[in-house]
Amino acid sequence: MVKAPIQRSDELLDRIEARRPLLIAIDGADGIGKSSLASWLAWQLGMPTVHLDLFLTSLHPIQWLTADLKRAVDRRLDLKRPVIVEGVLVLDALDQICRKADFVVYVAGVGGIGLAEQLVEYQDVRSLPGSADFSLDGYRD
């Protein structure tokens, strides 16, 4: 089921507030504005953000420090406290730590650091942006 993309970040905020999920995943290509959107949502919703870039060990293929990532996410969720996780291939990272997002935001657009082949395969497998709860066309303040 393809969901209609939202046009403004305040509309996204309203929809998230209505659902108030525990785990929000923000996905999209590199350099598209995921971190900026995550920071804005964290500020608006009063919840922390876990940036996958901080847990990277390799770019080709992308790999994370999964034990550390799991610990960071689990500490919030085990206490029933919300958390935002953002980054390229975020759904794969969450799979590796046995977590599922309650709410997925996909930031659409063209990325920048040469992960194109891996991203195309990932988007096909994950059916993004169509399977996301919401899809933005880039994020700009």
Predicted regions and their residues:
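N-terminal pre-Walker A segment at the start of P-loop NTPase domains
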Residues: M1-R19
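Hydrophobic anchor at the beta1->P-loop junction of P-loop NTPases
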Residues: I26
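P-loop (Walker A) phosphate-binding loop of NTP-binding proteins
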Residues: A29
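Conserved glycine(s) of the Walker
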Residues: G33
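Hydrophobic positions on the alpha1 helix immediately C-terminal to the Walker A/P-loop
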Residues: L37
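Active-site signature of alpha/beta-hydrolase-fold catalytic machinery across serine-
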Residues: W40
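Conserved nucleotide-sensing/catalytic segment adjacent to the nucleotide-binding pocket
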Residues: M47-A101
